[in-house]
């Protein structure tokens, strides 16, 4: 089972956390879930060049707090918070509510599966060699002190091949069946002239023991 399910969703009941934190009546639940989905996609597309690793939406009554985890907070905040305020007004215009925006810097971007996968996909779109890109990414990730293992799977018409295939690169340990294992996972897509190439990244950061 550990090979088939999403490693992050599989561990939500042990040590994971949801991207949406709120309670809603059953009649409003579907509407709120859909709104969270579109808000998250809008935020990620608006700051695709910056590198958003996580979007957390918290709701309480009529208030809504959105926390953005990114590599370079200064590019989102802007001079004296002008860019952040401008984006807040764009959210109000598009979705009909004025949220409270918080920006948190990702201290270790090389141990974030989201940022690593997006970086690999971006370089593949620039027509770089997939083997060189992935091996370099794995070496960079393994230099982090908290990382115990990393695996990258790349699928599609690699290097423009006529037949699509999957290449898997792995270093260290990735215990997918261990529930207490802190495994970060993400899937990114590289849109190339040959078609779409899928990039999957697993990063193992040790075990989590709760007393």
UniProtKB/Swiss-Prot annotation:
Q: Name one GO cellular component term.
A: cytosolic small ribosomal subunit
Q: Which residues form the KH type-2 domain?
A: 39-107
Which keywords, in A-to-Z order, does the entry hold? Ribonucleoprotein, Ribosomal protein, RNA-binding, rRNA-binding
Named from the GO MF annotations, one term is:
rRNA binding
Pfam families according to UniProt:
KH_2, Ribosomal_S3_C
Biological processes per GO annotation: translation
The UniProt record lists the keyword Secreted: no
Q: Which PROSITE patterns match?
A: KH_TYPE_2 (PS50823)
Describe its assembly. Part of the 30S ribosomal subunit. Forms a tight complex with proteins S10 and S14.
Main role?
Binds the lower part of the 30S subunit head. Binds mRNA in the 70S ribosome, positioning it for translation.
Which protein family is named in the record?
Belongs to the universal ribosomal protein uS3 family.
**Protein name per its UniProtKB record:** Small ribosomal subunit protein uS3
Q: Which source organism does the UniProt entry give?
A: Neorickettsia sennetsu (strain ATCC VR-367 / Miyayama)
């Amino acid at each position: 089972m550990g090979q088939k399910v999403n490693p992050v969703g599989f561990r939500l009941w042990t040590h994971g956390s949801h991207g949406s934190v709120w309670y809603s009546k059953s009649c409003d639940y579907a509407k709120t879930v859909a709104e969270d989905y579109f808000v998250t996609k809008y935020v990620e597309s608006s700051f695709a060049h910056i590198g958003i690793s996580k979007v957390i939406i918290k709701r309480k009554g009529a208030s809504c707090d959105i926390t953005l985890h990114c590599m370079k907070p200064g590019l989102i905040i802007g001079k004296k918070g002008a860019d952040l305020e401008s984006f807040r007004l764009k959210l109000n215009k598009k979705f009909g509510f004025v949220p409270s925006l918080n920006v948190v810097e990702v201290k270790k971007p090389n141990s974030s599966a989201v940022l690593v996968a997006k970086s690999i996909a971006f370089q593949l779109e620039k027509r770089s060699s997939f083997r060189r890109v992935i091996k370099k990414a794995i070496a960079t990730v393994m230099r982090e002190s908290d990382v115990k293992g990393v695996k990258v799977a790349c699928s599609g018409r690699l290097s423009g091949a006529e037949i699509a295939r999957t290449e898997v690169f792995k270093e260290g340990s990735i215990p997918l069946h261990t529930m207490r294992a802190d495994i970060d996972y993400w899937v990114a897509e590289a849109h190339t002239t040959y078609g779409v190439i899928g990039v999957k990244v697993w990063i193992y950061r040790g075990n989590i023991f709760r007393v």
